[in-house]
């Protein structure tokens, strides 16, 4: 509803994370994309300088087999931070998600088509775990913590300014769509007792 006036006026907008947390809203955004409306959304974690060297570049670790991310606060608002920490590293291709936790302690397992198992521990009061990721491969492993939030937020805003100037989205819509599927499915899995949710690959 907050986006509607800008969408109707064809004003390009940046929508703070997460874009949405349910499939009904996601389909509205999909409709707007199909109509050529202009908006983007992302988490600043995508732009953390500590993670950037590993964006689609983990050759020294061999084939990635396991990724672990820790995050504080709620899955609904901060799960996207964890997901968007991982996404530029492993790329698209998430197959399933399972959340065996509860509203305060989201313990999430995801499977990726590249043969990677990913765990996210999104625990409400675990502030010490914010922005910590472990990458384990067939040849090596590393743990990284993001600390320079100024850099991440600045680069995120720069990406929006560039979008306004060029019309080129910094993140392809299909990636944003997949991320929002994961946010929504993580909630659905938890609310249904921890069942595994397989992603719909139609989009």
Give the residues covered by each predicted segment.
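Rossmann-like dinucleotide-binding domain that binds NAD(P)(H)
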Residues: 64-129, 174-181
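Generic hydrophobic alpha-helical segments
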Residues: 3, 29, 54, 159-160, ...
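C-terminal helix-rich "cap/oligomerization" subdomain common to oxidoreductases
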Residues: 4, 163-203
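A contiguous active-site-proximal alpha/beta segment in oxidoreductase catalytic domains
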Residues: 14, 19-77
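Rossmann-fold NAD(P) dinucleotide-binding segment
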Residues: 1-15
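Interdomain hinge/lid region at the active-site interface
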Residues: 127-168
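A general structural signal for well-ordered alpha-helical segments in protein cores
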Residues: 26, 51, 82-83, 153, ...
